[in-house]
């Protein structure tokens, strides 16, 4: 396994517009330098370009299959949301999906092509002066844009999330950081918990 703390503004996989300077390129180079051979990076989870935090990379097919089929990987994020969220601890359960070429995920019934989505929200701090809420969000499903869409649907888009109408005055990227992963070690089966601090730009917004 390789665990990476991805900085914001880095793309995970090469695209037609961005073929180099991606996380995948960097991991291939890292494997070549440390192991002396070329390995294809097998990403268990992915993050949007402007999202920071922990990513799991499997070094072989067995580890990838173990993570996908044999263990539950708990993923928890730290988030700064626009506005003051009054409830301390709650779930958001709304099916989400996209329509046509619109990149946004909206509330969409499963009958109309949406997918079930469940997020647990725990408020950590309310900043009434800046009108923002600092919170933890744990994913119980892994839909694209799930946290961003769910918070938007309850009227509290992420600070810096232009796509979902978040407050752009105090941040230029969505304030979303994958800070904790919990899963079983594929070799020893011991329970692992990996945590990383929030990046500097999020700390600045919270000041």
Model-inferred region functions:
Residues 22, 72-76, 91, 116, ...:
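Short edge beta-strand segments in beta-sheet-rich domains
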Residues 159-187:
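RNA substrate-recognition surfaces in RNA-acting enzymes
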Residues 20, 77-82, 153-168:
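Flexible glycine-rich active-site/ligand-binding loops centered on an Asp-His dyad
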Residues 1-100, 201-205:
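RNA pseudouridine synthases
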Residues 32-33, 82-83, 108-111, 122-125, ...:
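Intrinsically disordered, low-complexity segments enriched in polar/charged residues with Gly/Pro
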Residues 11-12, 135, 169:
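Conserved short-loop catalytic and cofactor-binding motifs
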Residues 37-68, 94, 98-154, 178-207:
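The conserved catalytic core of RNA pseudouridine synthases
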């Amino acid at each position: 396994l390789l665990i990476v703390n991805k900085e914001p503004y880095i793309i995970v996989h090469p695209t037609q517009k961005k073929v180099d300077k991606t996380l995948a390129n960097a991991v291939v180079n890292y494997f070549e330098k440390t192991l002396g051979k070329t390995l294809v990076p097998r990403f268990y989870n992915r993050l949007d370009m402007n999202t920071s935090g922990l990513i799991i990379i499997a070094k072989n097919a067995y580890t990838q299959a173990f993570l996908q089929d044999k263990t539950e990987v708990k993923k928890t994020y730290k988030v700064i949301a626009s506005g003051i969220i009054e409830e301390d601890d709650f779930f958001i359960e709304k099916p989400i999906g996209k329509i046509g070429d619109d990149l946004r995920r909206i509330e969409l019934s499963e009958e109309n092509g949406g997918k079930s989505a469940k997020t647990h929200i725990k408020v950590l701090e309310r900043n009434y002066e800046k009108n923002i809420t600092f919170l933890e969000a744990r994913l119980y499903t892994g839909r694209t844009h799930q946290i961003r869409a769910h918070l938007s649907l309850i009227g509290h888009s992420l600070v810096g999330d232009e796509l979902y109408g978040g407050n752009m005055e105090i941040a230029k990227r969505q304030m979303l950081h994958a800070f904790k992963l919990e899963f079983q070690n594929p070799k020893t089966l011991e329970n692992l918990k990996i945590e990383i601090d929030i990046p500097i730009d999020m700390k600045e917004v919270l000041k």
